[in-house]
């Protein structure tokens, strides 16, 4: 979460008159994040999150994102729930931006996730996949295999200034992924960005997921692969197999992977590393200093890419055979 668009109390008060959430007592910007502007609201009825959607978020996608949160909450998944306006809509306009209010989710994200946190996230992700199975809307993943080569071409010319040899490495990975990307795996609603800062905990207990603004319809096991990249590498870039095994055990205890999904895990994990390297690399090379967009080091994911090239089976990530459906 972040703040890119400032709002004042007068315009916020006018906006809140369209909601039945009590009287505003205080509000403050939330500094973390990269995509949209977020504020924590305190009212006489409780706490809420106000989001102003910035240019990177397509307004046409908002009904999918908000509808998904509404659907998942109704299915018992802990996540922010959109607050419906007095006119029945979920989206309004504030400071020239589309804006929405969602309920506040208790908890905090873990900067140093433990094995228990990884297992809880895996279990929660599987519950999310099952809860989203009957969600009627679809949204194409705008950052999947067909999109990686065009995105890479925007950065390719300068990539070797970040790391010598990165052009050759990335070209080889893209060639491999384009030849080996799996077809006909189970698909459904995925989070697609379930990093530690998008999962809240109360102690070791998962209290819920947030930030569904990359959610889309895609391969379910790809979501697992994103989590292996996001949760199971240490600060020195080594892969923690114990955390990986816990995350996979948590997931497969709720939704066992098919044999085809298990066999594809190393390709999916390699692809997920490339996806996040490419978006980080693009921002690293193109976003000017002082911009509101928070740049993240692409080399963290280059090192993950190198690790995945050495993997020969899902077992090396910690996948146990009892987690694979017969």
UniProtKB/Swiss-Prot annotation:
Any one Gene Ontology BP term: threonine biosynthetic process
UniProt keyword list: Amino-acid biosynthesis, ATP-binding, Kinase, Nucleotide-binding, Threonine biosynthesis, Transferase
Enzyme Commission (EC) number: 2.7.1.39
InterPro entries in the cross-refs: Aminoglycoside_PTrfase (IPR002575), Homoserine_kinase_II (IPR005280), Kinase-like_dom_sf (IPR011009), Pseudomonas-type_ThrB (IPR050249)
A molecular function (GO) term: ATP binding
Reaction catalysed by this enzyme: L-homoserine + ATP = O-phospho-L-homoserine + ADP + H(+)
Disulfide bonds: none
Keyword Repeat among UniProt keywords: no
Pathway assigned to this chain's UniProt record: Amino-acid biosynthesis; L-threonine biosynthesis; L-threonine from L-aspartate: step 4/5
NCBIfam families found in the cross-reference section: PRK05231.1, thrB_alt
Similarity comment: Belongs to the pseudomonas-type ThrB family.
Matches recorded under HAMAP family: Homoser_kinase_2
PANTHER family per UniProt: AMINOGLYCOSIDE PHOSPHOTRANSFERASE DOMAIN-CONTAINING PROTEIN, AMINOGLYCOSIDE PHOSPHOTRANSFERASE DOMAIN-CONTAINING PROTEIN-RELATED
Name assigned to this protein: Homoserine kinase
């Amino acid at each position: 979460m972040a703040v890119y668009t400032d709002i004042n109390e007068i315009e916020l008060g006018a906006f809140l008159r369209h909601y039945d959430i009590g009287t505003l007592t205080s509000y403050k910007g939330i500094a973390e994040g990269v995509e949209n502007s977020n504020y924590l609201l305190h009212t006489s009825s409780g706490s809420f999150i106000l989001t102003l959607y910035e240019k990177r978020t397509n307004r046409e996608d908002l009904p999918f994102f908000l509808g998904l949160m509404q659907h998942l909450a109704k299915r018992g998944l802990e996540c922010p729930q959109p607050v419906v306006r007095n006119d029945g809509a979920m989206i309004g306009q504030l400071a020239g931006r589309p804006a929405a209010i969602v309920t506040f989710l208790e908890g905090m994200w873990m900067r140093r996730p433990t094995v228990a946190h990884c297992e809880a996230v895996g279990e929660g992700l599987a519950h999310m996949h099952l809860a989203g199975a009957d969600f009627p809307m679809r949204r194409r993943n705008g950052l999947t295999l067909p999109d990686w080569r065009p995105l890479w071409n925007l950065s390719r010319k300068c990539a070797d200034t970040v790391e010598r040899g990165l052009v050759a490495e990335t070209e080889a990975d893209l060639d491999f992924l384009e030849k080996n990307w799996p077809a006909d795996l189970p698909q459904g609603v995925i989070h697609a960005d379930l990093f530690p800062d998008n999962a809240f905990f109360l102690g070791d207990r998962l209290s819920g997921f947030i930030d569904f603004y990359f959610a889309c319809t895609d391969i379910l096991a790809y979501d697992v692969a994103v989590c292996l990249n996001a949760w199971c590498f240490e600060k020195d870039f080594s892969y923690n197999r114990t955390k990986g095994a816990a995350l996979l055990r948590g997931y497969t205890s709720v939704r066992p992977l098919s044999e085809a999904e298990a066999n594809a895990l190393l390709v999916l994990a390699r692809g997920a590393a490339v996806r996040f390297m490419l978006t980080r690399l693009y921002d690293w090379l193109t976003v000017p200093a002082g911009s509101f967009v928070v740049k993240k080091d692409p080399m963290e994911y280059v090192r993950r890419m190198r690790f995945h090239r050495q993997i020969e089976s899902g077992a090396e990530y910690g996948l146990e055979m009892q987690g694979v459906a017969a």
